[in-house]
């Protein structure tokens, strides 16, 4: 009996050791050399997990390559100090997991003493979902990574409670980073509770793909607060945008594709519960040169419901024949409230430059529309984890 018990005990210990080894194998460590004071390089394998008690100085490009994962725990701070060269990019087949919380968001910000939009690049994610450039794949305008494909449910990870501040550094003569750029990102990716704050270009931009989003805040970005092109077709809920800092353009700039207005798949997002607050209809025409809440052009479709628009020269600004033809069957806003100071609720311009009646783009108005949740005010879901509102 004693011998049998000893044998059973030995087998139990061996089994436990084997299980532990198997679990370790599932979470294989990476060969990446993690240096917090010089955070850059190529994550080519395994999983790199950051430490929330450490501040990471992003001095150059950090690229997560196919098969690798970058995991960022709640409360982690990453400071960009490398200007244009400092950005985080996620390659096709790689993943980023941002595990922030309302109390402890992950913060990607400027490491400069005096912080300004454009102090560092931003976050770039490349997926395998469809685009409409006429080729199955393409190279991202920032980072140069490949994006696009045929995988609508492609998964690039999970992003929750993330704040991106002072991004938008110039990448080339005519290209700038956005706060968060989605290149062909699929709807297997989770994006919830993200703020883009005071970047020098767009807050969020979607280049094709099918990614869905919830609870996005774009505040004080110096170009458009939201932008899409190349056939993006995500489903979205709760967007809040507000211009600030004395400079900016549209609430939304929306294209199908600049060089093929009818290219398929056609951009066709659905957005429910959105507030767009502008600089005022009489704002300075130099610093706020494109004073429209929604610029819908180049063949885009879209459906917008429960929308609050305030303080813009133009509300729904529809341009190009293909876009106008989509009104109101495939391009429309319902339950819209022009809360204050929107002298031109709609405006239309054909491709030849002549005017068009696009009043039908607003299919219904609602005096009780709440937009992102609280009319023009900060929605409650943005409490605690956002800044500037």
Q: Which residues fall in each region the model found?
A:
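Extracellular beta-rich repeat passengers
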Residues: 27-54, 58-65, 69-70, 81-93, ...
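Aromatic- and Lys/Arg-enriched surface recognition patch
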Residues: 105
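Bacterial Sec-dependent N-terminal signal peptides
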Residues: 1-6, 11-40
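Short, charged beta-turn/beta-strand-edge "cap" motif at the junction between a beta-strand
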Residues: 77-79
